Regions:
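Surface-exposed binding/hinge segments that line
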Residues: 115, 149-191, 212
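Gly/Pro-rich hinge or "lid" segments in bacterial periplasmic/extracellular proteins
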Residues: 94, 182-233, 237
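Periplasmic binding protein-like
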Residues: 56-59, 390-444, 474-478
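Structural transition elements
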Residues: 325-363, 380-383, 470
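N-terminal lobe/hinge region of extracytoplasmic solute-binding protein
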Residues: 59-107, 138, 203-204
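Extracytoplasmic/peripheral linker and loop segments enriched in polar/acidic and small residues
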Residues: 398-403, 407-409, 438-505, 528
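Alpha-helical secondary-structure segments
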Residues: 129-136, 164-168, 206-207, 235-237, ...
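Ligand-site clamp/hinge motif
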Residues: 226-271, 398
């Protein structure tokens, strides 16, 4: 995504958190705004407004990986179809009600009391209660779930129930990203959670129920007739089709077999932009940042001069234009422009300068070297890897490309078994800045994919995280220190910031994504 619509997203001030009791009104306002927008859009297309019925088909290049249900992975389309979260962010990172209707933060930031909806049923017919929130938090605390926000979930040390629909979470210390956890944490059914991670059964409280899963082919869902959001969903069902070939995905969109996709290659999106059959939407979440990762246990890349040389070698502008179709912003830092951690100086720190790259390699005693370079075997990711391979070759760094399927790469990230270099995209910078450094596998100060460790990095990250605010001058100063470490050490070499790009057929309305890319179809419908 090129940029946010606002120069900076406000942090979660104590006042904003304490007025959570008014958030229900905010939810109604947002729903009204969304309905108004959809109505206006429908009027323009000759439709009378929201229409019940129909099955929405979604095309994606990567299959759903059930074992990563509770982690951020390459396919997060399923989560919000089947499940709900406690709260959801609006465009200004202000939490709005979902399963939690209101909240009250303790004055010292070490606890939060949640009031919960009383009209929610799981797909099995069981009533949702505070016990399910307790289970959801403990589920993310389980290391087996590989949840990136496990560290934030782990700050919850006690649960105090006041009946079935009020719960206080007691925290070990204040954290600046508590509502990031609530946006991320889906509420599963405790009785079937092991079936969920095995991919045999998904039971939640969400708008759709799983009807069939064909691994590598498709996943189908039917409307939840007992959904708590009255009158929703409009759709009869949803089918997610796995289409790994870029040309096949593009063809299925053009022929109308697929209504919606977030997996279209940048160059194909650019070609569709002027086609009236499609509506192109950039999500201004900055939820994806393309990067090169370095495994510091590997020969040569353990020297930060080599990593800095790589940062100077890459032509980021060409990468954005050729591989992303112009849908991205060149950046040396992970932060989108909306983040309180963003600065123009940081974003522009590394530009395309092959001479500087060669000089750094020479300082490191190298003129040429050969390194393994892993990348996702999806077409778009392969195109990015090939551009990077060319740039590195120009300064004397030969790379051997290692195409790998996305689930395997995710497991390698988690297990710290990446080769010397790899390229992927990361999230978590679109939220409160501390979340990136305590949650994202490439950046986690305690245990990251690069095997990077630094007392200074750990200290500043913990200071930024262990505070109730995220946007004060003191917090911003800590974010700058984190950025300084990242730009100097370059164990993660950021290249470009881009959000998801939605390609939708002209009949599709009301689609939304949350900050983690969970597909929300509560208000979606197909025009006649």
């Amino acid at each position: 995504m090129t940029a946010f619509t606002t120069p900076s997203a406000p942090g979660l001030s104590r006042r904003a958190l304490l007025r959570g009791g008014l958030a229900g009104a905010g939810l109604l306002t947002l729903a009204a705004c969304r309905s108004a927008a959809d109505t206006a859009s429908s009027a323009a297309s000759g439709s009378a407004g929201p229409r019940r019925g129909g099955v929405l088909t979604v095309g994606t290049g990567v299959d759903f990986t059930p074992s990563l249900l509770f982690a951020q992975s390459a396919n997060t389309l399923v989560q919000r179809l089947v499940f709900n979260t406690l709260t959801r962010y609006d465009d200004r990172l202000q939490p709005q009600p979902e399963l939690a209707t209101s909240w009250q933060l303790a004055a010292d930031g070490t606890g939060i009391t949640l009031k919960l909806r009383e009209d929610v049923l799981f797909h099995s017919g069981r009533r949702f209660t505070a016990d399910d929130v307790v289970f959801a938090v403990k589920n993310l605390q389980n290391p087996a779930r590989s949840a990136q926000l496990r560290s934030t979930a782990a700050t919850v040390t006690d649960f105090r129930k006041n009946g079935d629909f009020e719960l206080t979470l007691v925290l070990a210390h204040p954290v600046s990203n508590l509502f990031d956890l609530f946006e991320f944490m889906i509420i599963p059914d405790s009785a079937t959670v092991e079936d969920a991670v095995a991919g045999t059964r998904l039971v939640g409280t969400g708008p759709f129920t799983l009807t069939e899963r064909k691994p590598g082919s498709s996943i189908t869902f039917a409307r939840n007739e007992k959904y708590w959001n009255a009158g929703r969903p409009y759709l009869d069902g949803v089918e997610i089709r796995i289409v790994p070939q870029a040309e096949s995905l593009l063809s299925s969109l053009k022929t109308g077999q697929t209504h919606l996709s977030y997996s279209v290659r940048g160059k194909d999106v650019a070609a569709l932009k002027s086609d009236p059959q499609f509506r192109i939407k950039q999500y201004d979440t900055g939820s994806g940042a393309y990067y090169i990762g370095a495994n510091l246990t590997a020969e040569h890349v353990s020297d930060k001069r080599v990593r800095q040389a790589i940062a100077w070698a890459v032509d980021r502008d060409r990468l954005v234009q050729q591989a992303l179709g112009g849908y991205g912003t060149v950046s040396s830092v992970p932060w989108p422009k909306s983040s309180p951690a963003y600065s123009e100086a940081g974003a522009g720190r590394y530009s395309h300068d092959p001479d500087k790259a060669r000089a750094l390699l020479k300082d490191a005693g190298l003129t040429t070297l050969t390194l393994p370079f892993a990348h996702s075997n999806e077409p778009g990711a392969t195109a990015i890897a090939q551009i990077l391979q060319y740039d590195l070759k120009q300064v004397g760094i030969e790379t051997v490309l290692q195409p790998t399927d996305s689930p395997t790469m995710q497991k390698q990230l988690i297990s710290q078994t990446m080769p010397a270099l790899w390229t992927l995209s990361h999230g978590f910078a679109q939220l409160h800045p501390a979340t990136l450094a305590v949650s994202a596998y490439p950046f986690n100060e305690a245990r990251n994919s690069s095997h990077f460790s630094s007392p200074a990095y750990t200290d500043v990250v913990q200071k930024a995280w262990n505070r109730p605010d995220s946007d004060s001058p003191e917090a911003r100063a800590l974010y700058q220190q984190i950025t300084d470490v990242l730009l100097d050490e370059e164990f993660v070499i950021d290249l470009a910031i881009a959000g998801l790009v939605e390609v939708a057929g002209s009949k599709v309305r009301g689609v939304d994504l949350n900050k983690f890319g969970y597909l929300n179809l509560d208000d979606s419908y197909l025009t006649a």
